[in-house]
Amino acid sequence: MSLLNLAPQTPDQNLINSLQKAGLLESPVDAKFTVLTGGVASEIWKVETDKKTYCVKRALPKLKVEANWFAPIERNRFEVAWCKIVGDIMPGSAPQIYYHDEEKMLCCMEFLDPADHALWKAELRDGRCDPIQAENAGRVLGRIHSISSSDKAIQEQFPRIDIFHAIRLEPYLEATASKHPDLKEVLFALSKLTSETRPVMIHGDTSPKNILLGPNGPVFIDAECACMGDPAFDLAFCLKHFLLKCLWVPAEREKFLKCFEVMVTAYLAEVSWEDRSAVESRTAKLLPGLFLGRVDGKSPVEYVTEEGEKNKVRRCATELLVSPPSRLMDVVDHWKKELNR
């Protein structure tokens, strides 16, 4: 878990009780508690004691956004499962879990110091878009998907799809249709197809704000949306950010688009559970819907604020939704044309 904006406070007694039950806290008086901000789905604390520094994460029933966005708190259980599985199959690619309280739906996990675990979103914001990092992220994500595709024991740990629908498909695709009635049919069709395609264990929130650049490779955090799902979602969810960053840091557009390209190549090289072209085709068709959802869905990206920039996203996404591409570089080509208008 990364350290973002800090605000010292005191947690409630229920949280304190869980930590004491876990043996991770003796007296709260002797510990330092700090709220970690930056996310919308959970209450997150950094806890410092004489013996250990760690994070506590408790899922919220209503997400911290303007829209009414609710999701089952049981997602905390599946985040824990995802982290433990990835810790076994790809050591170092997820935070270590120390404790999970099934009753209160909170977990305690490893704290990853920002000094050697840079937040990828912050790096991209500052124009440090190293294609090697994108290649590494694509390769690790692809390997996680590949290993999970053939492991029934992993698949049995994710019996639910309703959480993924509530926290991903509805807010990003279906809610977007309310502002684009002409695209309702295609957006709901994408939601349905994605929901019904479940060959691998997916993370569900693979944006750069949830990827830390560690000394031994990328570390994926905040896997609250984890489930058996469509790998195209994880890939598209990350790739759309390289497109959006072209508006945030225009001077680095070519580097962002290069990151897009190398991540695609590295990821597809790991695909083993189905034909690579099938994964790429679904990703290319889904990406425009998620792209549009970051402007007109329930969780609009905070750095695209000018109406002219929003309209660029809308035009490009609409064209691609109406005439779906089968290759991901076709999406890049359309976006380049829009940026140069």
Locate the predicted segments by residue.
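Active-site activation/catalytic loop segments of kinase-like enzymes and analogous catalytic loops
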Residues: 81, 232-273, 287-305
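ATP/Mg2+ or Mg2+-diphosphate-binding catalytic cores
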Residues: 3, 251-254, 290-341
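Active-site catalytic-loop/activation-segment of kinase and kinase-like phosphoryl-transfer enzymes
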Residues: 2-14, 110, 143-193
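ATP-binding pocket architecture of kinase catalytic cores
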Residues: 36, 41-153
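Acidic, serine/threonine- and proline-rich low-complexity regulatory regions
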Residues: 270-282
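Juxta-kinase regulatory segment immediately upstream of eukaryotic protein kinase catalytic domains
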Residues: 1-33
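Short Pro/Gly-enriched beta-strand edge/turn motifs at strand-loop
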Residues: 24-31, 79, 184-196
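Active-site acidic catalytic loop and adjacent metal/ATP-binding pocket
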Residues: 34-50, 54-56, 189-233
